Structures are given as C-alpha cells and as structure tokens.
Amino acid sequence: MFLPIKSDNGAVLPWEYMPAEAGTYKAGQLLAVDATTGQVEAITADLTTTPPYLCMADITVETAGTPIPVTRVSRDYIYETTLAEAATGAVVGTKLQVEAGGLMASKPATGSGTFEVVALDGTAAGDAVRGRWV
C-alpha cells in the first residue's frame, strides 16, 4: 500500500468521495479513472505514469457508482510502499513504476516510472521504499 508520510508544506491531504467501479478496494491502493464511466477503478496493469487517486479505506463496492473515500495523488508528499520484486541497482533518484493492483512499486524492465525514490530500506522484494511523484 502507498501511505502518505510527509508533506512539503505541512498540510493534510483532503479526502474526496469519488464514484467507483464495482470491486474491492484497500486503503493505500492507487486508483485509475475509467475513461468510459469516469469512475475510479483498480489499476489492472503495471503503470509508468502517475495514478490520480489513492483509496483511503478498505471497502467493497457492490454497485458501480458508489462513492468511496480517496485523496488526489500529490507531488508535494512523500509516500511509503514496498517493492513487489527485487529492484537491483535502485538508488535514491531511481524512478519506479506502480505494480498492477496499485499496492506496490517495482523497477521497470525498460524506461522509468514516475515514483522517484527518496529513501530505500533495501532492494529486495518486500523492502520499504519512500518516494515522491515527479
């Protein structure tokens, strides 16, 4: 899960309620927006761009369109998550991608993502990593 840890300006992230596609969501899960319905949904593939929303509760949506609590992903915050797999060679400044499901980060096989590492506990799967969106 992606947890907001620290802000540049000391402000608290405001919550919004956005309509969601049917499904089960977890607090700290990054979400995309369905281009057809405009509702938030789980990320279904690895993502090298910045997702727009972060879910703020464990919730199951039975009926599409039910609002769920989210915050907008902010470039002014540092977030903490875990590595989905070993990220050999990752150092401060490495840009990671969001794994499918929106709960962890990984080092892309080619290119770079938009989650820039600011601190690492290690580079093994499951190690904590902190970063900001660039």
Which residues fall in each region the model found?
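Surface-exposed, low-hydrophobicity beta-strand/loop segments enriched in small/polar/acidic residues
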Residues: 1-134
